[in-house]
């Protein structure tokens, strides 16, 4: 696996790559734009090229993340159109920066019902993948199940992907906190969980992992990340996940609560120590 964390690109993509390297990252994640909005700039070709060259020099892998505000299942036609345009730009920027994929949360049905939410998501994804013709895959992320969130179960993610017209352009990102809070695994049954995920085809489509502890207990359906070893997964639980070999070959990035990016350095080192 390639361990790392989330890095800001507010000072430019090349600087983000330098910051990731300085913190001891082997992989890093970045937001394509402000995570709370739809407005963003297209990637600067020169800066993107410099960043990609640095990534190659340092052996870094990058993962992009679309804004949290994106709702693939919105029933509002205007908001759907805005979301598609925004995600198209996210994918274009992710491709320019050399990211292995662009993460997007599963949709929220906002009271319209789960069946509607899934159908609307498929429609939105079809329109998006018709508009964006590049090579960067969209990585759908599992959710904790807060409110009307879809995508708590792996089977649901697989179903949505199977219904899309171009499923080969969609893969997955697995969040350890979300899945635990959704109640779909415990550390003590991790091996069985991964075996099931492999059996249904999900694990073979996994391209990135978010390594987070959980501030709330198993099945709480609350999306609140905790620092590694400080939540309900605990040190033993995080160690179980890391030592299992399930994340072999994948970028594994921390999205844990920090006041400053520099705090990620010791936490990445801590994660590596759990592999011993």
From Swiss-Prot:
Key words, A-Z: DNA damage, DNA repair, Endonuclease, Hydrolase, Metal-binding, Nuclease, Zinc
SMART domains: AP2Ec
Catalytic activity field: Endonucleolytic cleavage to 5'-phosphooligonucleotide end-products
Cofactor requirement: Zn(2+)
Ligand binding (Zn(2+) 1): 65, 105, 141
EC number, UniProt record: 3.1.21.2
Positions with a binding annotation for Zn(2+) 3: 178, 223, 225
GO molecular function term, any single one: phosphoric diester hydrolase activity
Pfam family, one: AP_endonuc_2
Signal peptide: none
Manner of cofactor binding, per the entry note: Binds 3 Zn(2+) ions.
Residues annotated as binding Zn(2+) 2: 141, 175, 210, 255
Any GO BP: base-excision repair
Family that this chain belongs to: Belongs to the AP endonuclease 2 family.
UniProt-listed NCBIfam families: nfo
General function of this protein: Endonuclease IV plays a role in DNA repair. It cleaves phosphodiester bonds at apurinic or apyrimidinic (AP) sites, generating a 3'-hydroxyl group and a 5'-terminal sugar phosphate.
HAMAP family per UniProt: Nfo (MF_00152)
PANTHER family cross-referenced by the UniProt entry: APURINIC-APYRIMIDINIC ENDONUCLEASE, ENDONUCLEASE IV ENDODEOXYRIBONUCLEASE IV
The protein's name: Probable endonuclease 4
Protein source organism: Symbiobacterium thermophilum (strain DSM 24528 / JCM 14929 / IAM 14863 / T)
Designated gene of the protein: nfo
């Amino acid at each position: 696996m390639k361990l790392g964390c989330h890095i800001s690109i507010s000072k430019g993509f090349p600087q983000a790559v330098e910051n990731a390297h300085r913190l001891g990252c082997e992989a890093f994640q970045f937001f394509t734009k402000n995570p709370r909005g739809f407005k963003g700039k297209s990637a600067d070709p020169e800066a993107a090229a410099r960043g990609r060259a640095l990534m190659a020099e340092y052996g870094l892998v990058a993962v992009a993340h679309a804004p949290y505000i994106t709702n693939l299942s919105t029933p509002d036609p205007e908001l759907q159109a805005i979301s598609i345009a925004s995600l198209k730009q996210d994918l274009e920027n992710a491709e320019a920066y050399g990211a292995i994929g662009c993460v997007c949360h599963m949709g929220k049905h906002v009271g319209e019902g789960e069946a509607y939410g899934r159908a609307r998501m498929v429609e939105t994804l079809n329109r998006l993948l018709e508009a964006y013709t590049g090579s960067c895959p969209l990585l759908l992320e599992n959710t904790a199940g807060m409110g009307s969130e879809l995508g708590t179960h792996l089977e649901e993610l697989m179903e949505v992907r199977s219904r899309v017209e171009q499923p080969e352009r969609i893969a997955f990102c697995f969040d350890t906190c979300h899945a635990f809070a959704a109640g779909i695994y415990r550390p003590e049954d991790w091996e069985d969980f991964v075996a099931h995920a492999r059996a249904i085809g999900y694990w073979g489509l996994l391209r990135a992992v978010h390594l987070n502890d959980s501030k709330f207990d198993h099945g709480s359906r609350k999306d609140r990340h905790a620092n590694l070893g400080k939540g309900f997964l605990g040190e033993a639980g995080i160690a179980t996940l890391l030592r299992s070999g399930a994340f072999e070959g994948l970028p594994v990035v921390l999205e844990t609560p920090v006041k400053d990016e520099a705090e990620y350095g010791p936490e990445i080192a801590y994660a590596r120590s759990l592999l011993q």
